[in-house]
A protein has these predicted regions:
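Short, charged recognition helix plus adjacent turn
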Residues: 3-7, 14, 18, 82-138
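Short, basic-rich loop-to-helix N-cap that marks the start of a DNA-contacting helix
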Residues: 59-73
Length: 138
């Protein structure tokens, strides 16, 4: 282990990862239940394995910080698209106001979990950047 990296795989690191996985997993599950996206769409568009999506939804602590970072883009992408569709009447919903209130609440939770990373993702989406293309660049 290199100098300065002794915290990795420590109890503190595992504890932190567990807390973050719990929050991200719950938000992802809520998005899937509310039909904002599906595991199949996530797999097709972002290349995330079904097993990874399942583990995150079940809040398994074996999920790495790299996966957590990847899902910052995934969650931000689908939340932004859904909010935009409902706001602009591009998606037919029974109760538009309650749907928007729920989406705004999810967006705030997303920003609380991911902080500055969430702000960057949402700004990229607002600027019309193709997030899927950006994710696939090497």
């Amino acid at each position: 282990m290199g100098k300065g990296r002794s915290y990795m795989n420590s109890y503190a690191d595992g504890y932190m990862r567990g807390k973050v996985v719990k929050e991200v997993g719950a938000l992802l599950e809520h998005m899937i239940v509310e039909e904002i996206t599906t595991p199949t769409i996530i797999n097709l568009e972002f290349g995330s394995a079904y097993d990874t999506i399942r583990k995150l939804r079940q809040q398994e602590t074996s999920i790495s910080f790299e996966i957590i970072r990847q899902f910052c883009y995934v969650i931000g992408y689908y939340l932004y698209k859904e909010i935009e569709a409902v706001e602009n009447y591009k998606k037919d919903v029974r109760n538009r106001e309650s749907r928007l209130a729920m989406l705004y609440e999810m967006k705030e939770k997303y920003k609380k979990i991911y902080g500055m990373q969430a702000v960057v993702v949402l700004n990229l989406m607002h600027q019309g950047k193709d997030l899927l293309a950006l994710m696939k660049r090497v």
